[in-house]
Amino acid sequence: MVRKTLKNKPLVEAIFELRWALQKVAPGMKIDPHYWIAVGRIDDRLQVDYPFHEQLPTASIPNEIAGYVVQHRFRKGEGQWPLVQLGPGIITVNDTEGYHWADFEKQISRTIGALFEAYPGGESALKVNDVVLRYINAIAFDI
């Protein structure tokens, strides 16, 4: 099948997001008990595809209130796309202008494989509770 690329495609960003259950430690407080171990181990596994690691300012948020907040970003190079984002209970794969479904699907598959490999206890320790594929489009209007 021939890949057709639109000249002026409206896609701004494609986002794959996977969330898993957090552990309740107190009323209103949930944590990912293996998050800090997983960050380093996922970084190791993503190095080939995403060697540039950014720790985001949100990484300073206390663990008890940081659930589902992205704290680390892995890129091919500074400011480059696609990218992978990670936080307690959440991992995303994002792409923009270079988006093609076949490539994006492979990136998702490799990223999820890295997560399941890196997370202490593996796939059985993660209780996936949400998987989302989202597209953000923009169309210019002359008003």
Where are these regions (language model features)?
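Short, surface-exposed linear patches
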Residues: 38-40, 97, 114-117
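Secondary-structure boundary elements
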Residues: 102, 106-127
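Conserved aromatic-histidine-acidic binding/catalytic patches
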Residues: 4, 96-103
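Intrinsically disordered, low-complexity acidic/polar segments
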Residues: 25-27, 102, 142
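Glycine-rich, often proline-containing surface loops adjacent to acidic residues and nearby aromatics
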Residues: 10-17, 81-99, 127-134
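Beta-strand elements of well-folded, non-transmembrane domains
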Residues: 20-24, 97, 137-139
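N-terminal low-complexity, intrinsically disordered segments
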Residues: 1-86
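Aromatic/basic-lined ligand-recognition segments
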Residues: 1-3, 71-75, 127-143
